[in-house]
Amino acid sequence: MIEEILPAEVAAIDAVDEDVADLFAVERAAIGGAVPERRREFAMVRKSARTALGQLGIPPVPLVPGAGRAPVWPTGVVGSMTHCPGYRAAAVARSSRVHALGIDAEVSEPLPSGVLQMIGLPSERAMLARLDEQHPEVPWDRLLFSCKESVYKIWYPLAGTMLEFDGAEVEIDPGGGFSARFTAEGPVAAGRRVSHLSGRWLHRDGLLLTGIALGMINLPGISLRRDDHSPRLQLAISSGELTRSSLGWN
């Protein structure tokens, strides 16, 4: 599914299987202290990432966490990984074609009570109220969270600093697109200041997916479908509240 919201320049793989996935020794060392469920997620999403890299002609390589726990991709490649219960995905592209990638997957259910007030700007909360009246079948607050996660995965490799949830104002198009405007000075890509991003979203099979591909030529972003077209401590949703976690890069 994830490939439907990313351009043809991007190799994207997703899966719902629970097959055992092997890790390189250096990867096992990097995740050795984690609980079994976390180690399984770490391995499975890297299986998808290596499959996607294979579509670019790149043989299997270790994908270890680097600065800010972000995965270190092979030279000449940009990428992004994500997982949620029952789903995992990875997207990669040549850095000569795409400058940065951000994808996120969430279970299609509303955010826990109080979380929207923590992540949403007043303008965003007003937008969600309007969208909910028109299309109540979509958990718009969770979609907003996912959009902001994809935005962050674009931001961090370019800026190398944290981006708080109020650092970007998101506007969601019910037709399947979204845009994000940085509320402070944006990062630099290909010698140009990036002030806003555009992406796509998909709601299907109990999942919410978001994706952004920041193009090298047509900055600020590539948002067409294929058929027409310092470390962050992530605020992760856990047990009904936001908790700080360093596992947001997958």
Give the location of each predicted region.
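Core catalytic alpha/beta fold that binds nucleotide/phospho-ligands
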Residues: 1-250
